[in-house]
């Protein structure tokens, strides 16, 4: 079945990674993209505006019970878990998971429960293991899984943990993820493309 949602999880180095990814997606991109970027309680409220400067797609922090719309980028608010329920968002102040709130695992698990095999999960650079369990849940439901190559990530711990937990469909450098997403959404229901090849990213990005 064609994909209906993309969920992305990242931590250390994630802002630069998200800039690189979002600036490579056109305004016509057809799916909603939901992002968990680990950040502290005192982080800047303007993160969605900051990322919006690099994106052709509108970027915002969703409110509780807000419907999910195609062609938007949704960023988990600081200090809230972001879940998907009945094609809408739900915000939770449940305790942190893997020392994180928002938690990648929480978002990914809820997306897998809601959209099943119509989910694409993406793990980018990061410094802990949050997201590995959630990505495994997406794969177990028949969804597609993409992990940034730990060798080219700013911080390889998070992608490496995901690879240890499951066998992702693709392990690729950061700059190849956006083209892969375009291929996966351009011809819906088509045969899965092979992992693209290309030069590795330099290790110069920071959060």
Question: What positions do the PLM features span?
Answer:
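Conserved acid/base catalytic micro-environments in cytosolic active-site loops
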Residues: 1-207
């Amino acid at each position: 079945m064609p994909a209906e949602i993309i969920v992305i999880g990242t931590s250390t180095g994630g802002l630069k990674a998200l800039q690189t990814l979002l600036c490579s997606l056109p305004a016509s991109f057809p799916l909603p993209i939901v992002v968990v970027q680990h950040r502290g309680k005192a982080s800047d409220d303007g993160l969605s505006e900051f990322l919006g400067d690099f994106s052709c797609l509108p970027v915002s922090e969703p409110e509780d019970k807000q419907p999910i719309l195609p062609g938007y980028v949704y960023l988990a608010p600081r200090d809230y878990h972001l879940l998907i329920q009945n094609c809408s968002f739900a915000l939770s102040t449940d305790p942190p998971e893997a020392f994180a709130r928002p938690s990648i695992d929480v978002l990914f698990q809820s997306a897998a429960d809601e959209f099943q095999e119509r989910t694409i999960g993406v793990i980018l650079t990061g410094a802990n293991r949050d997201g590995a369990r959630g990505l495994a849940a997406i794969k177990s439901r028949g969804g597609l899984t993409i992990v940034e190559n730990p060798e080219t990530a700013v911080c390889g711990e998070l992608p490496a943990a995901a690879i240890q937990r499951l066998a992702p469909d693709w392990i690729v450098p950061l700059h190849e993820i956006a083209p892969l997403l375009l291929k996966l959404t351009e011809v819906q229901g088509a045969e899965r493309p092979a992992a693209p090849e290309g030069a590795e990213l330099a290790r110069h990005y920071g959060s």
